Amino acid sequence: SIFLRSLKLSLMTTVLTLLVGFPTAYFISTRPEKTREFWLFLITIPFWTNLLIRTLAILVIIRNEGLVNTILLKLGIIDAPMQILFTDTAIMIGMTYVYLPLMVLPLYASMEKLDFRLIEAGYDLYAKPMQVLRKIIIPLVKPGMIAGSILVFIPSLGAYVTPSVLGGGKNMMIGNLIELQFGQGRNWPLGSALSITLMIIVMAALLVYVRNASKTGAGHG
């Protein structure tokens, strides 16, 4: 169903933004203080442009004659253009690009407070990089991970513009279905029911965040 599809795409988008945003935020937090503002400025640049324009920029890159296919063809990795546009993959790529700053900024806020002496102590005790990441860094930046995940999951679940442009109207999400019921379908009762269901899911996600934030705060206290 469209609801399950929307949940899957939103969760996968959240995971992708976390995988990209985590090393990005760590990189920024380890830069000299004078250059951090510059890197944060680059991260926030997309917010200065309209959502539709940002989505159209991705469309140009992943279309059959776009940058991705052109590079892969010239490198001989593929023989014919890949059909990325108008697929779930295109929607995930688009939403990951659009919502990435919402993941990076909370992660950076947590990583900025990291005591890097703990990381150095871990290496002094011959801990491997993955052990340092798993046992030191992740527990300390968990609040930022949770906050970023919620900030990405909620808007991606109700996304309308990005699925419409990159999905081509064939791969609908909840937001598209709601618009269809209120617009062309003229089925306002169903549209209202879908909207309320979406609000319940969003409230549940917020409740999870509040509970985790409370536990984290209690743990630090």
Identify the meaning behind each predicted range.
Residues S10-F22, Y26, L107, L140, ...:
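Hydrophobic positions within alpha-helical transmembrane segments of bacterial inner-membrane proteins
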Residues I2-S6, L73-L102, G144, S149, ...:
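Loop-to-helix entry region at the N-terminal start of transmembrane alpha-helices
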Residues S1-V15, G183-R186:
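Periplasmic/extracellular loop-to-transmembrane helix junction in inner-membrane transport proteins
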Residues T55-T96, M130, L166-K170:
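Membrane-interfacial helix termini and adjacent extracytoplasmic/periplasmic loops
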Residues Y108-I119, Y123, L190-G221:
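C-terminal transmembrane helix and the adjacent membrane-cytosol boundary/short C-terminal tail
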Residues V60, Y160-W188:
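Glycine-rich helix-loop "coupling/hinge" segments at transmembrane-helix boundaries
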